[in-house]
Structure formats: C-alpha cells, structure tokens
Amino acid sequence: MRSDTREEISAALDAYHASLSRVLDLKCDALTTPELLACLQRLEVERRRQGAAEHALINQLAGQACEEELGGTLRTALANRLHITPGEASRRIAEAEDLGERRALTGEPLPAQLTATAAAQREGKIGREHIKEIQAFFKELSAAVDLGIREAAEAQLAELATSRRPDHLHGLATQLMDWLHPDGNFSDQERARKRGITMGKQEFDGMSRISGLLTPELRATIEAVLAKLAAPGACNPDDQTPLVDDTPDADAVRRDTRSQAQRNHDAFLAALRGLLASGELGQHKGLPVTIVVSTTLKELEAATGKGVTGGGSRVPMSDLIRMASHANHYLALFDGAKPLALYHTKRLASPAQRIMLYAKDRGCSRPGCDAPAYHSEVHHVTPWTTTHRTDINDLTLACGPDNRLVEKGWKTRKNAHGDTEWLPPPHLDHGQPRINRYHHPAKILCEQDDDEPH
C-alpha cells in the first residue's frame, strides 16, 4: 500500500495553500455574469473535494490515537484544535466513517461504506447537504433490506445527487424509501433508537427552542398531564394565585387568553416546578436536585441584569426573584470577585463549597469545554494527597472526562487572579489558552488591561 513521506505531505499542503492564496488575490472585474457563475461553480467543486481529503486523516486518528494522546475524545480534540463546534466535529467523524477508506482487522484497505457517494464527493459533484440526505436515507432504511438492493439504492441516490439540489434529492429519497420499505419501522427497537428531546441554545432574548421525537408512552404520559394542567384557566401565570390542584371555574376560564401552546408551556413549568419542590429527586453531585443560580449583590438590589444557573442558562432578575417564592433553590451572591473562604479537612467538597463553585466557575474550567456546572465534578487543583485539605480557593469544576486528564499528564494550578489554569503535556501544547472563559462571556468582552490571561 502506498504511503507518502512527511516531506511529500507537507509539500502538497504548502502547494495547496499557495494556489488558494493566488486565487484569493484574483481581481475578477473583467468577467461577465456567466463567467462569474462558472468561477463559483469551479470553487464549489474544490470546496467539496476538500471534505473528501479530510476523511483519511480523521479515520487514521480514530484508529491510532488514544484519548491520552488527543487530550480527550476525538470529537473534543477536533472541536478544540479546529475551532469548530462539537456537533460539526461529530458530523465530520460520521462522514469520514461512511465515505473514507477503511481497514480490515488484517490491515488491508477496504472501500468506503457508501462507495458511490464517496466517489461523487471526491470528484466534487456532491456536497455536504447531498451527503446528509443520503446518510439520513440509510439511517431509516430497515436492516431487512438485502445488501444488493442497498448498494443499488446508494448508487442511484449518488448519481441523482450529482445533478440536483439537496432539497430536490430529499423528495426522490423519500419516494425510494416508500418503495423499498413501505411499512416503515414500527418495532419497539426502532422507536427506542429514534427517541429523544433536544433543547436548543438560548437565543438573545433568553428563549430556547425544543424539539424531538416522543415514544408512544411519553406522549400518553404528557397527554394525561396536559389534560389537567393545560386546561383553560389552569396554571395561568396572570392569576394572582394560579390554579394547579383545583378545577378552574368559569371565571378563571374566561380570564384565560393564552393559546394552547402557551398553556402547554405553563403546564410543563408547573409540573416540573412541583417535582423539584417535592424533594423526591434525591441528590445530584452532592446537592439536592434544585436550581442553583449565581448573581451579584448589586444586580439583586437593583433588580436588573441576569443570573446564571448551574446549567449555564441566563435567567432575568425578574424571573429569579419570582422563582425564589416557589422552591428552596440556591442563590449564591458575590459582593466582589472572590468566593467565601470555606475550609474543611474532608476530601469531598461540602455542599456550600459546591454552591460557590457553581457560582464562581459556572462549568468545567478546562479551556474549550462547555460542560455546565450541573455536569461537572469538584476537582482539587493541588492534589488532595499533597495538601489533605479541601479549600474553596484550591477547588475548581471539571467534567468527568477532563477530571481524568490530570491522571494522563495534564496539570492544574491557580494563578494570581484565582483562575484555574490547565497545562497540557508537551505533545498537546500548541499555544492554546490556559483558562476557560466560555462560561464567562462578559469577562471576554469587558476584560481590563491588567495582563490577565484569557
């Protein structure tokens, strides 16, 4: 099997960079409209081919590199090194698995799983969205469809994709699915595989989108809850005392001007609020399951600004003050930048220390990690075996995978500002930040000129 030398690989990438630099310097004022479109078409071909060039690199990393070498999972390593989202990293890994060359257990090269699709991408005839449609088709196609038919379907879809937009390909793929698998996937196993609920990122106004697929059991459960709590007049936030337990009377129904969607929202809020208040969820990482919010004394007194939850959500002060009347949530206040000085000699952090770390760090302190406080563990910056103390000023938050990195060559330390610095082993050090500012965007935007690292 052919293998290029390091010098040949570096020279090829240098030539690629130089060629692209030449293209970037082109002045196209003399071109006509048809010529401009033709140039864009040629650039699109090369954009698509670049994706194919990445597959071998990603698959080789997946096969030879362990988490210790990568500094985490392959998904995390790609996201941090390439400055892409973890979701985009996962997409590239999945695409490489489907379209990149594989190796047998004996080391022999194997063709791509989606052979025709891979060939079309290498020629620049199809792009990312075409590939996404073809991958989605095979994700839904029943395993009962034999290999020969699957290969023929893949070849047909790849050929159709070369002359169509991705949105047009979708309709053809849907028709082909109807022919090959008219009854659909209705087994318990398929439903279990497809189930899921996703809560999107908070938008600028604090609102979040929710989407997903519900199993019949969850749908039936939600229907029963909504029948009670989303009925007209129930759980109406405009009422001085919203009705939850009792049946709304005619006057309560008449006052209710909410849409059904708004009543559904308020019903979910009432149900989950009641569950939190019940105390029946036990503990999570050493604290009762509840809402932990951090804010400053100044903002609380002014009733302006936003608090930040242990999950990383921003909560307007008006909501925060109202929430305080419904359950025993934790509110951590800062009258300055430093946390309270809390000490004890046990290795496990106390609940009070965890609350302060939720408020101070807001999430995993390793640079590049977006895990919120709810999904993080308490980490001793200086190993407990050295100090035998659990001092709030020597603690930080780290998610499970990052916490374990300390056993694999990573080191942590506190700087003069009280921030936790993560020092990678030499083979992973490419000049990346030492401090995680992801959970503190205000510090990035309003950082003072005090030589504070960021």
UniProtKB/Swiss-Prot annotation:
Q: What Pfam families does this protein map onto? A: DUF222, HNH
**Name listed for the protein in its UniProt record:** Uncharacterized protein Mb1179c
For this protein, what is any one GO molecular function term? Answer: endonuclease activity
Instruction: Show the SMART domains listed in the entry.
Output: HNHc
Any idea where the HNH domain is? 364-405
Phylogenetic placement of the source organism: Bacteria, Bacillati, Actinomycetota, Actinomycetes, Mycobacteriales
Which domain of life, per UniProt?
Bacteria
Family recorded in the similarity comment:
Belongs to the Rv1128c/1148c/1588c/1702c/1945/3466 family.
Protein species of origin: Mycobacterium bovis (strain ATCC BAA-935 / AF2122/97)
InterPro entries xrefs: DUF222 (IPR003870), HNH (IPR002711), HNH_nuc (IPR003615)
